[in-house]
Amino acid sequence: MHALIIDDSRAMRSILRRIVTELGFETLEAGNGQEALDHLESGTVPALCLIDWNMPVMDGYTFVTKVRENPDWRDVTLMMVTTESEHGQIVRALAAGAHEYVIKPFTPDAIVDKLELLGLVRDGVAA
């Protein structure tokens, strides 16, 4: 099972990569929403996208809306992982099609718990 980590911070991508690889996911990475969209358009469709909101070129919100416009990608689970903590931003992301929302800073358990709720992880392993 693949996870696409979308964040302009290499350090954050590394943190998220460590968390999801320990769960058994294979990872792909993108530094912005456009790079992530290019992965999807090339035929590499992951089970999960972990998405930052604030990125250059294409932000996470725009990425979510574009993914939801394409019926071929309807099964991709989208989880925002961002510093945007205003209630309105959270509602906006979920209304656009994100499944979950985690606010930075976070603990690894926060990510694992959300993935368990989404059915992507069972007993600490990718389902």
Placement of each model-derived feature along the sequence:
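Charged docking surfaces used in two-component/phosphorelay signaling
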Residues: S14-E22
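Acidic, metal-coordinating helix/loop segments flanking the phosphotransfer/catalytic sites
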Residues: E29-L48
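Conserved Asp/Asn-Gly motif in the active-site loop of CheY-like receiver
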Residues: A30-Q34, I90, P108
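Receiver (REC) domain active-site loop signature in two-component systems and cognate sites
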Residues: M55
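Short, glycine/charged-rich "phosphate-handling" switch motifs in NTP-dependent
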Residues: H99
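C-terminal output helix
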Residues: F106-L115
